[in-house]
Design a protein with these regions (language model features):
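Extracellular LysM carbohydrate-binding repeats and other cell-envelope/extracellular binding modules
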Residues: 1-33, 75-106
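Primarily a LysM-type cell-wall glycan-binding module
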Residues: 1, 27-68
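Active-site scaffold segments
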Residues: 184-227, 233-235
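Gly/Pro-biased beta-strand-loop elements
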Residues: 100-199, 230
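Second-shell loop/turn segments in exported
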Residues: 46-64, 103-104, 173-177, 184, ...
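LysM (lysin motif) carbohydrate-binding repeats in extracellular/periplasmic proteins that recognize
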Residues: 1-5, 58-84, 123-126, 219-222, ...
């Protein structure tokens, strides 16, 4: 785009079209400060299974995900802020509007590390950075379909089917929460144990392996969960 930095009206118009300013102000609420938060998320699945919920560990982790941001970036933007004090005004990313158009088909592109969603007319409506497949659960090939969508799912750890974590050789139910193995969303595919899901660690998307085949940030997985429905096709590209 060839807007001059002095063209204030033009810049405002372009920003409004794309969803407004890059940043917004946000006032921390008593609910934000209260949580509840967990002190830390254990690595071990046996210990995870004993918790009531795999919640966020801090106000900054919760707010970073709510505003589609890296947690360290949120802290760097607000070096003086006391995030635990209700009424504190912080600067957050203004991520624009959520996509609301229903999805007709999805492409999971391993080469580009990207999930793309298309509407019924074939227009691309969303593109999300993704981690696709792992050594434990290589991603499927060909075309599959969404079978169901679960928000805030618990996770069944079954060492006989998927992978083995530590010394855990029994089936475990891992409680729900944004810091669970599949984050806060599970979009099941018609191939058993495979799905599109969230992540406990958004900074590793596109870099680390996925336990359920296609991993997105929790915020992208939540957006996608609201616009997909059972029967939507998911095509895997190498």
């Amino acid at each position: 785009s060839n807007l001059r930095s002095t063209d204030v009206v033009g810049i405002q118009a372009a920003l409004e079209q794309s969803g407004g300013d890059a940043f917004a102000s946000y006032s921390i609420t008593p609910e934000d400060a209260a949580g509840p938060y967990v002190a830390s998320v254990p690595e071990d699945y046996g210990q995870k299974a004993q918790l009531e919920r795999l919640s966020y560990t801090s106000v900054t982790e919760a707010l970073a995900e709510r505003f589609h941001m890296d947690e360290n970036y949120l802290k760097a933007l607000n070096p003086e802020a006391n995030f635990n004090r209700p009424g504190t005004i912080i600067k957050v990313a203004n991520f624009g509007r959520l996509v609301a158009t229903p999805v007709a088909r999805i492409i999971a592109d391993k080469g580009k590390k990207q999930v793309r969603a298309y509407d019924a007319s074939g227009k691309m409506i969303a593109a999300y950075p993704a981690t696709i497949g792992s050594a434990d659960t290589p991603s499927p090939t060909g075309t599959h379909a969404v079978s169901r969508v679960a928000l805030d799912p618990n996770y069944t750890y079954n060492p006989n089917i998927n992978f083995r974590q530590g010394e855990n050789n029994k089936i475990l139910t891992i409680p729900p929460g944004p810091n669970g193995p599949v984050g806060s969303v599970w979009i099941a595919l018609d191939k058993p144990t495979y799905g599109i899901h969230g992540t406990p660690d958004p900074s590793k998307i596109g870099k680390t392996e996925s336990h359920g085949c296609v991993r997105l940030t929790n915020w992208d997985a939540r957006e996608l969960a609201k616009i997909v429905s059972p029967g939507v096709t998911v095509e895997f590209l190498d």
